Structures are given as C-alpha cells and as structure tokens.
Design a protein with these regions (language model features):
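Small-residue-enriched flexible segments
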Residues: 1-53, 59-60, 64-324, 328-341, ...
Length: 368
C-alpha cells in the first residue's frame, strides 16, 4: 500500500490556495490524486486541476466540489479553499471512471483495474441526476465487495466533479482492486425517539396511517408532549428514519419531514413509501451526534493494527459546524481518535455508503 501526502489551504485567489497545497504535498512519487474544492472556486475547477497536474506530475485525479471541504483536523466552510491528497498506487490497482448518467452507462463503464476485477470504488455523484440513487445501487453491483463510498456534490454554483478532467451529470470516481485495503464505517448522528412502525396507508410520500392509526397521532406520541405542543419547533431536530432491511448494525436512512397536515393528521417525508414499509422517528442533536461519532471511531480503531496511511471523509452539509461546533470539531474528533494521518474530503449533499444514498451521515474510509 502506498503512503500518502496531503495539503489544504484557503485563499481568495485559487492560485494561492493551490500553491499552498502543492507546497504541503511536497515531492515524491504519486499516481493518483484526490482534489476537493469549495464551491466558491467551482468556476475555476478546470484551471485548478490543470495546475495541480502540471505542478505535481500526478497523472490521475478524482474529486468534486463542496460547500465545504475538509482535511486532517480542519474544516473549510463558506470560504474559498482546496484540499488535496496524493498516493502512489500500483498502475493496475485502480481505474478512474466517469460518464455514468444512466443504467446503460453502469453496464458499459470500464471499471477493471488492469486485468483485475474491481473490489470497491470511491464515487462522486451529481445530485441533479434524478436516477442517482438507482445508479449508486447498480454500480455497487459491479464491484466485487458490493461496496461504494463517496458523496453527492454540494454547490451553489456548478455541480462539477473531477475524473481525469472536469465532468458533470452523473457518477464518476475511481475503482480499486483487492490489493488496495481499506476500512470504512458510517456514523448516523441520530437516535430513535420511538419504536419502528408499519405504514398501513400512504400516498406517494404522504403517510396516512401507521400501525392502523392516524400518522400524526403516532408521531406526536413518539416525539413527546413538549415538542408535540408546538410542531413549529421540530424543524432540523426530528426526522423520519427508514430501517434498512437485513442490516446487522441497525442502519437506517434519514429523511426530512417535509410537511404536516394537522387537520387530516397526515405527515409527508422526503421519500416515496408503500404500505408495509417500516418507519420510525428520530432526533438529531449535538449530544447524539458526538456519541455516535465516538462509537464509529472506536469501532474502526479496534479493527486496525497500525495508524492509517491515508483516508477520505464524506460528511453531510447538515453536520460540521452546525452540529459539532465552529472550530472544526468533527474533524478534530477523527484526529484525536486515530492520530495524525493524511485525510481529505468534503461536505456532501448526500452520502454514499455500501450501495445506498444516506443523509445526515459521515462516511470515513481509511487506507490501511
């Protein structure tokens, strides 16, 4: 496995930020680079990529744009910044891919690493592609482990990605052969407020009844009397959780509550539901997020025999400073638990883990 080098910097002028990163990267062999830029620099992404390739000599690059980017112990949110990492992988151990915008593209995209079957992949996705969830699931079926990690571009400008060039519109990233060893974990940051319920009547994303009772009545019982008295207070605190069938870790997909109809006692969530589906309600707050982050980091640490060589971290834009605090607290937790090692990533508009899209999660992947 290669060793990794990394750099990160903020500057209004993209060249200043890029040069600061390149200086930190230093000299040494590298075959693959990871490049994340904040959306304030999105309009210059092509120039930034060309500059990194020219100045470092690294031939292959992957990455994307985020409202925020991150590096070891550091978060850059709402400022012009770049985070980059480089590793010297064997030539036949990885393959950069792009142009996956439809089901047919998933079937046809070249993922083999030399002659080796791809084992897993790091993926960046365009949130404006309405098939993105299905594309992620299908692409996971093309890699041997069935495991993808990554995130959806988050940008107030262009939703651009890097895959040996600047691309957009679908999925891109890099696949790896099984001689590239990784460890990965996910942290949810929410805690259930009540038991699982069965959807007994629904229409598209509107829940009519749960367990044979009016959906809003069940919801109010679960969230408790204090919140139920003033439903205007639940925004950003209470979410719908959709348990993942067959998960041995109790994982669930977190979806926003998008509407409440008190007169008809209905609830609308950010997901289409069929009768028979399971749903629960959960709460997101700083205490819960810290506890689950600590659990995740302890879990991944216990499975390691040495310090990570490098890593990537993909966290929801709804986490970071708004959930953990303003002084890069989320990234500092990783450093404190696992030590100082090269790490880069970005704050996503949806996170990819295994074969699914998540929300309000953090996905940590370590090269070991």
């Amino acid at each position: 496995m290669p060793d990794f080098r990394y750099g990160h910097a903020a500057a209004q002028d993209w060249k200043q930020a890029a040069e600061a990163c390149i200086t930190q990267l230093g000299q040494g062999p590298a075959s693959l680079g990871f490049l994340y830029v904040t959306d304030l620099l999105a309009d210059h992404l092509g120039d930034i990529l060309a500059h990194f390739r020219s100045r470092t000599g690294i031939p292959h690059w992957v990455g994307t744009v985020g409202i925020g980017v991150c590096a070891t112990g550091r978060e850059y949110l709402d400022e012009a910044a770049i985070a980059a990492m480089a590793g010297d992988f064997e030539p036949d151990s990885f393959r950069v891919f792009s142009g996956v915008a439809s089901a047919a593209d998933v079937d046809n995209v070249a993922l083999k690493c030399g002659g080796a079957t791809p084992n897993f992949a790091i993926v960046h996705a365009d949130p404006h592609n309405r098939h993105v969830a299905d594309l992620v699931s299908r692409l996971a079926g093309r890699v041997e482990s069935g495991f993808l990690v990554g995130g959806l571009t988050s940008s107030r400008r262009q939703n651009l990605q890097v895959a040996d060039g600047v691309v957009e519109g679908g999925l891109s990233g890099v696949s790896f052969a099984d001689n590239v060893t990784v460890a990965t974990r996910l942290t949810q940051g929410c805690s259930p407020l009540g038991p699982k319920h069965v959807v007994t009547a629904s229409q598209q994303n509107v829940i009519i009844s749960l367990d044979g009772r009016a959906a809003l009545d069940v919801f109010k019982e679960d969230i408790g009397e204090s919140l139920a008295r003033d439903l205007n207070r639940i925004g950003g605190q209470v979410f719908a959780g959709l348990p993942i069938a067959g998960s041995d870790t109790g994982d669930y997909l977190v979806r926003n509550l998008v509407g409440i109809d008190p007169a008809n006692r209905l609830i609308a969530i950010g997901e289409l539901l069929q009768p028979g589906a399971s749903v629960m309600f959960c709460r997101r707050d700083t205490k819960t997020a810290n506890e689950d982050m600590t659990r995740m980091l302890e879990s991944i640490r216990k499975g390691m025999f040495s310090r990570p060589r490098g890593g990537v971290y993909y966290s929801c834009v709804g986490r970071g400073a708004s959930l953990f605090g303003p002084d890069s607290e989320e990234l500092k937790m990783i450093r404190e638990a696992l030590g100082e090692f090269p790490l880069v990533g970005f704050f996503c508009n949806g996170e990819i883990s295994h074969n699914r899209l998540y929300g309000y999660t953090g996905v940590l992947t370590l090269f070991v």
